[in-house]
Amino acid sequence: MASHLELNNGTKMPTLGLGTWKSPPGQVTEAVKVAIDLGYRHIDCAQVYQNEKEVGVALQEKLKEQVVKRQDLFIVSKLWCTFHDKSMVKGAFQKTLSDLQLDYLDLYLIHWPTGFKPGPDYFPLDASGNVIPSDTDFVDTWTAMEQLVDEGLVKTIGVSNFNPLQIERILNKPGLKYKPAVNQIECHPYLTQEKLIEYCHSKGIVVTAYSPLGSPDRPWAKPEDPSLLEDPRIKAIAAKYNKTTAQVLIRFPIQRNLVVIPKSVTPVRIAENLKVFDFEVSSEDMATLLSYNRNWRVCALMSCAKHKDYPFHAEV
């Protein structure tokens, strides 16, 4: 299995990255330092995670120590929904760049297709608890993303949480300069995303799987929610390979030719999550894992369900 996947502009993207969603600011610096020391080269960030400054401290330290060269790192961040207005994209990008203490990013994604009302709140809500949308169209936002590439600020651009119809709208944009190179989506055995992945691959778009372990530390977890890590069927498959359940859950997307970004701030787990290139899950076990799909989402973003660009209504 490849340790890198080639993007549609020839850039190579490491198959395994460190996720930083929900990594507490006080722990994420150490987590990123440990990850780089262990051999991680791909770090997945976002402005809305509110910890990019701390990630930047770790990156700077490792670059200064010459543990790694900048060109060997693959740093990803994402444009938040309150900055979809074309005039706001560059400012949001520059904030991320300065927080991460970098001169350029390797990949910048539109985090969600849904534009929100600009302002200090990341989730501006009305009295009924619904997100207040902005009067923006992500196709226009894409034009501003393309300008970042032209200015040499980012090597590659892509999307996240977009459905095929939404990607199609970008691909059909008049005067399109750069196709989305990546679509980052939630993906694990309870949400296998076969149709969406098949669509993306048919368009030469690499898919990154987030929440590969089902995001067990999500704040809104309910006791009755299914747990991938505790699923006895997945535990049994892992035992067969003398691997942990997490390692099988990380290996699963890799064998589907996806990029995967498990999050951890625990050094032992960060190391364990990297040890997924020395075994192969059989095609029978892969088919079994795929059969566990139940279209169960960790990240359904229900506060946006009434938004015109909410991505999860149509399973197309």
From Swiss-Prot:
<feature type="modified residue" description="N6-acetyllysine">
    <location>
        <position position="263"/>
    </location>
</feature>
<dbReference type="GO" id="GO:0046370">
    <property type="term" value="P:fructose biosynthetic process"/>
</dbReference>
<dbReference type="GO" id="GO:0043066">
    <property type="term" value="P:negative regulation of apoptotic process"/>
</dbReference>
<dbReference type="GO" id="GO:0052650">
    <property type="term" value="F:all-trans-retinol dehydrogenase (NADP+) activity"/>
</dbReference>
<dbReference type="InterPro" id="IPR023210">
    <property type="entry name" value="NADP_OxRdtase_dom"/>
</dbReference>
<dbReference type="GO" id="GO:0003091">
    <property type="term" value="P:renal water homeostasis"/>
</dbReference>
<keyword id="KW-0443">Lipid metabolism</keyword>
<dbReference type="GO" id="GO:0047939">
    <property type="term" value="F:L-glucuronate reductase activity"/>
</dbReference>
<feature type="binding site">
    <location>
        <begin position="211"/>
        <end position="273"/>
    </location>
    <ligand>
        <name>NADP(+)</name>
    </ligand>
</feature>
<dbReference type="GO" id="GO:0047655">
    <property type="term" value="F:allyl-alcohol dehydrogenase activity"/>
</dbReference>
<comment type="function">
    <text>Catalyzes the NADPH-dependent reduction of a wide variety of carbonyl-containing compounds to their corresponding alcohols. Displays enzymatic activity towards endogenous metabolites such as aromatic and aliphatic aldehydes, ketones, monosacharides, bile acids and xenobiotics substrates. Key enzyme in the polyol pathway, catalyzes reduction of glucose to sorbitol during hyperglycemia. Reduces steroids and their derivatives and prostaglandins. Displays low enzymatic activity toward all-trans-retinal, 9-cis-retinal, and 13-cis-retinal.</text>
</comment>
<dbReference type="InterPro" id="IPR020471">
    <property type="entry name" value="AKR"/>
</dbReference>
<dbReference type="GO" id="GO:0072205">
    <property type="term" value="P:metanephric collecting duct development"/>
</dbReference>
<feature type="modified residue" description="N6-acetyllysine">
    <location>
        <position position="95"/>
    </location>
</feature>
<dbReference type="GO" id="GO:0043795">
    <property type="term" value="F:glyceraldehyde oxidoreductase activity"/>
</dbReference>
<keyword id="KW-0560">Oxidoreductase</keyword>
<feature type="active site" description="Proton donor">
    <location>
        <position position="49"/>
    </location>
</feature>
<dbReference type="GO" id="GO:0044597">
    <property type="term" value="P:daunorubicin metabolic process"/>
</dbReference>
<dbReference type="GO" id="GO:0001523">
    <property type="term" value="P:retinoid metabolic process"/>
</dbReference>
<dbReference type="GO" id="GO:0005829">
    <property type="term" value="C:cytosol"/>
</dbReference>
<dbReference type="GO" id="GO:0001758">
    <property type="term" value="F:retinal dehydrogenase activity"/>
</dbReference>
<dbReference type="GO" id="GO:0071475">
    <property type="term" value="P:cellular hyperosmotic salinity response"/>
</dbReference>
<dbReference type="GO" id="GO:0005654">
    <property type="term" value="C:nucleoplasm"/>
</dbReference>
<feature type="binding site">
    <location>
        <begin position="10"/>
        <end position="19"/>
    </location>
    <ligand>
        <name>NADP(+)</name>
    </ligand>
</feature>
<dbReference type="InterPro" id="IPR018170">
    <property type="entry name" value="Aldo/ket_reductase_CS"/>
</dbReference>
<keyword id="KW-0007">Acetylation</keyword>
<feature type="modified residue" description="N-acetylalanine">
    <location>
        <position position="2"/>
    </location>
</feature>
<feature type="binding site">
    <location>
        <position position="111"/>
    </location>
    <ligand>
        <name>substrate</name>
    </ligand>
</feature>
<dbReference type="GO" id="GO:0002070">
    <property type="term" value="P:epithelial cell maturation"/>
</dbReference>
<keyword id="KW-0963">Cytoplasm</keyword>
<comment type="subunit">
    <text>Monomer.</text>
</comment>
<feature type="site" description="Lowers pKa of active site Tyr">
    <location>
        <position position="78"/>
    </location>
</feature>
<dbReference type="GO" id="GO:0036130">
    <property type="term" value="F:prostaglandin H2 endoperoxidase reductase activity"/>
</dbReference>
<feature type="modified residue" description="N6-acetyllysine">
    <location>
        <position position="222"/>
    </location>
</feature>
<dbReference type="GO" id="GO:0035809">
    <property type="term" value="P:regulation of urine volume"/>
</dbReference>
<dbReference type="GO" id="GO:0047956">
    <property type="term" value="F:glycerol dehydrogenase (NADP+) activity"/>
</dbReference>
<feature type="modified residue" description="Phosphoserine">
    <location>
        <position position="3"/>
    </location>
</feature>
<protein>
    <recommendedName>
        <fullName>Aldo-keto reductase family 1 member B1</fullName>
        <ecNumber>1.1.1.21</ecNumber>
        <ecNumber>1.1.1.300</ecNumber>
        <ecNumber>1.1.1.372</ecNumber>
        <ecNumber>1.1.1.54</ecNumber>
    </recommendedName>
</protein>
<dbReference type="InterPro" id="IPR036812">
    <property type="entry name" value="NADP_OxRdtase_dom_sf"/>
</dbReference>
<keyword id="KW-0597">Phosphoprotein</keyword>
<dbReference type="Pfam" id="PF00248">
    <property type="entry name" value="Aldo_ket_red"/>
</dbReference>
<dbReference type="GO" id="GO:0004032">
    <property type="term" value="F:aldose reductase (NADPH) activity"/>
</dbReference>
